[in-house]
Design a protein with these regions (language model features):
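Short, glycine-/Ser/Thr-/acidic-enriched flexible segments
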Residues: 28-29, 36, 51, 109, ...
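An anion/phosphate-binding loop that grips the pyrophosphate of nucleotide cofactors and donors
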Residues: 60, 360, 467
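Extended hydrophobic/aromatic segments used for targeting, binding, or gating
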Residues: 222-259, 349-355, 359
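Divalent metal-binding segments
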Residues: 2-5, 10-25, 29-234, 238-243, ...
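His/Asp/Glu-enriched, well-ordered alpha-helical/loop segment
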Residues: 301-309, 318-320, 324-341, 346, ...
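Flexible loop/turn segments at secondary-structure boundaries
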Residues: 110-112, 140-141, 208-209, 215-220, ...
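Non-cysteine beta-strand/loop elements that form the S-adenosyl-L-methionine
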Residues: 63, 256-272, 362-372
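Active-site microenvironment of metallo-dependent hydrolases
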Residues: 1-26, 30-38, 86-95, 186-202, ...
Length: 521
């Protein structure tokens, strides 16, 4: 039993309650109010010293296993030129003399002195170890000659593979990532998952939606996350990235979709997000749609009939329209009162699309970090989109239309950081689209839990829900919105226990936690 007093507790519930006392028993909240009930008067009290306490944060779109994998290798986002990038890569190689390949992450033309992306020749000058660097946006990658020599013929023959530069786009990219991630040992992945979960907890994240399924043989990555998630400190909701509904049903999973095979278009960084009007710098280019409308409709109809919750990637307005049309077709074919299907990204949504999404009950899973992204700066977006750049992520319009809006990172594309995300939501580059601090906080707490039918246990500081919360040094609802990002985390509690980064579980302890939580399930 813990009796927490003298705190500024922000419930994030629908009534926006605040209070000064919260009592927890094991992993559940059992009381909230402004005075300690007589029943608990004899219990030891913990003085919160006026600090602010909010529900544990959520991240409603990430690729957790990819984030975990790249956390074990090299992130080159901070490299200021190719020489520095080479040093980072070779430092890792020197520290891992038995490595047979290196998957790295984060290159961008906008953050290096060369002002271009590295090509095969640049990578060959760095190492002859098979090397793949995934671009910062997670939608393209470049390989060195040593890796290209290992690629199977279907990658080399794919139209998305550029043999001259070594770059892989669209389907070639997905095949290339599948090829290299399929060679990662389960132990490496498991260790990476533990470290990744710890990094997320340090940021106050206790509730996660992850999209998984990137080509491991027999979908072992799906089975791995479905087991290991039970031993990690957060709550994980797993979406299977497949269009094969039977695979999901056989595993008794209830969520399908994501990116990869469910990416309806590309991204702005590769200028292949699907647009209704051409790119400003290349008017003849409207990006690409990965599927026909009929193909997407048929998938959504099958998944919706199976009672699954669907999520799909759509960045450009043409892809957004395709996704909404498919959801409409599925719900017309088999009406479900509360399906809560999800559209990931929704970067370019006009008011008609927003209204249609609201009528269909679609959740929009946005990534606020895209609005302040060094690897994809505003000047670049303006150069390719013109005036449309000011309409990226119209958060105000979405919330005003009654849409359920949830926030995430798309990790490893951006580094998960909910406080930074709340700051960006409140300081939108287009001030007309900014959210209030209360709304921004709910995109990281209550609304994510509600979007996946978990608001009975997560998302607010309410009796009966999980005792997962974050202690902050500032009241982010009352400080100037320009100062929100200066807020520091003073403590993280997950399921009633204080999280301490030094308390990494041993393999036997992890196994015991998995077994215990299997029994609870």
């Amino acid at each position: 039993m813990k009796v927490l007093t003298n705190g500024h507790f922000i419930s994030c519930d629908d009534e926006n309650r605040c209070f000064s006392v919260m009592i927890i028993d094991r992993d559940k909240i059992i009381f909230t109010g402004d005075s300690v009930p007589d029943t608990y008067a004899g219990c030891k009290q913990i003085d919160m010293h006026g600090l602010t306490i909010v529900p544990a944060f959520s991240d409603t779109h990430m690729h957790f296993e990819s984030y975990a994998l790249f956390g074990t290798t090299v992130d080159v986002r901070e490299a200021q030129n190719f020489e520095a990038m080479g040093r980072m890569l070779n430092d890792w190689i020197d520290a891992h003399p038995n490595a047979k390949f290196l998957p790295a992450y984060g290159c961008s033309a906008h953050t290096v002195a060369e002002k271009r992306l590295p090509e095969t020749a640049d990578l060959d000058a760095i190492t002859d170890l098979p090397l793949l660097i995934v671009k910062y946006d997670g939608h393209a990658a470049v390989a060195n000659s040593a890796l290209i020599d290992l690629f199977p013929s279907d990658i080399l023959a794919d139209p998305g593979f550029d043999a001259r530069t070594g770059w892989l786009y669209q389907n070639a990219f997905y095949k290339g990532v599948n090829f290299i991630t399929g060679k990662v040992s389960p132990i490496t992945l498991l260790e990476g998952m533990q470290r990744a979960a710890e990094a997320l907890a340090e940021k106050g994240i206790g509730y996660i939606h992850t999209v998984e399924g990137v080509g491991y043989q027999n979908d072992i990555d799906i089975d791995t996350i479905n087991i290991i998630r039970r031993g990690l400190p957060q709550k994980y909701t797993v979406f299977f990235q497949t269009m094969d509904v039977d695979k999901v049903v056989r595993r008794k999973m209830t969520h399908i979709g994501g990116c990869f095979s469910l990416a309806l278009d590309g991204c702005f960084g590769s200028e292949d997000a699907a647009l209704s009007e051409g790119y400003t710098n290349h008017p003849e280019n409207k990006g690409f749609l990965a599927y026909s409308q009929e193909e997407v409709d048929n998938f959504c109809i099958r998944a919706n009939r199976a009672g699954l919750q669907i999520t799909m990637h759509a960045i450009g307005d043409a892809a957004v329209d395709q996704a909404l049309n498919a959801y409409a077709a599925a719900l017309k074919d088999y009406p479900r009162k509360d399906a809560r299907h999800i559209l990931i990204h929704g970067d370019l949504m006009n008011k008609a699309a927003i209204q249609k999404a609201a009528e269909l009950g679609i959740t929009i899973a946005v990534q606020p970090a895209f609005l302040d992204w060094p690897q994809e700066p505003a000047e670049y977006l303006e150069s390719i989109l013109g005036e449309r750049a000011a309409q990226i992520l119209p958060l105000r319009d979405m919330v005003d239309a009654g849409l359920l809006v949830t926030s995430g990172s798309d990790a490893p594309c951006t580094i998960p950081d909910p406080i930074e995300g709340i700051h960006i939501c409140c300081n939108h580059p287009n001030p007309a689209q900014a959210l209030t601090p209360e709304e921004a906080l709910k995109t990281y707490t209550l609304w994510p839990a509600r979007s996946a039918f978990d608001d009975n246990l997560y998302g607010s500081l309410t009796p009966g829900k999980k005792a997962s919360f974050v202690v902050l040094d500032k009241d982010i609802l009352s400080i100037p919105k320009e100062d929100i990002r200066t807020t520091k985390i003073r403590g993280v509690f997950l399921n009633g226990r204080r999280f301490r980064p030094s308390e990494r579980f041993s393999m036997p302890e992890l196994a015991l936690r998995i077994l215990h939580n299997f029994r609870e399930d």
